[in-house]
Regions:
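Conserved beta-strand elements of the Class I
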Residues: 30-34, 117
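Loop/helix-junction capping segments adjacent to catalytic residues or to phosphate/diphosphate-binding pockets
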Residues: 10, 40-43, 93-96, 125-127, ...
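Single conserved hydrophobic/aromatic residue that forms the stacking wall/gate
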Residues: 1-11
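Helix-loop-strand module that forms the ligand-binding subsite of alpha/beta enzymes
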Residues: 13, 67-145
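Short, highly selective alpha-helical patches that border small-molecule cofactor pockets
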Residues: 42-46, 50, 99, 129
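Glycine-rich phosphate/pyrophosphate-binding loop and the adjoining helix
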Residues: 147-175
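Terminal amphipathic helices with adjacent charged low-complexity linkers/tails
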Residues: 12-31
Length: 175
């Protein structure tokens, strides 16, 4: 028998509440924006994309730095989310290791069909966004046809383009 206030009753109650929240009726759509950033540019991109998503309406947004968030936290947020964006700089013509670790927690059975998109900053070649998109497709997510990739820091004009990208992503999610 579980005593009131016992940790296991709290866990069971919170899990049940979460299950009900996830499965019952209309709820706010949720977007998870994950990124890793070498010089802060990809973080700035994530923030600009979030601004565009916010402008589309009633969508909850969670932004997580893959390098600092635990994989358990990221997976928990992914389970609650209807869509995911993944960002990375291009270093040595590739995305970063942290992004590959993120791919390991995306479950094609559980997450199949979730809307997804890739974004990233680069200095020279810019392959990261394409690599991310290809991996998201392989994991059975519904990847937008466009990625957002910009050279170095996204200045004001680029941030406006990123917000528009986020808005298009949100509208596709809501459609």
């Amino acid at each position: 028998e579980i005593a009131d206030g016992d940790w296991s009753s709290d866990v069971c109650s919170s899990d049940l509440r979460e299950y009900i929240d996830l499965t019952m009726g209309d709820r706010e759509k949720r977007v998870l924006i994950t990124y890793v950033s070498a010089y802060g540019y990809t973080r700035e991109m994530a923030e600009a994309i979030a601004t565009g998503i916010e402008s589309a309406g009633n969508i909850g947004i969670k932004i997580l730095d893959i390098e600092h968030a635990g994989l358990g936290e990221i997976e928990s947020e992914l389970v609650r989310s209807d869509a995911i964006l993944v960002g990375s700089p291009t270093i040595n013509q590739n995305t970063l290791l942290q992004v590959y670790k993120l791919f390991a927690i995306i479950n094609p059975l559980r997450d199949k069909g979730k809307l997804a998109a890739a974004f990233g900053s680069f200095g020279w070649s810019g392959e990261a966004a394409g690599i991310i998109a290809a991996n998201l497709r392989a994991l059975k997510l519904k990847v937008m046809d466009e990625n957002a990739a910009f050279k170095f820091r996204p200045e004001e004009e680029k941030r406006t383009e990123l917000a528009a990208f986020g808005n298009r992503f949100a509208k596709e999610l809501l459609s």
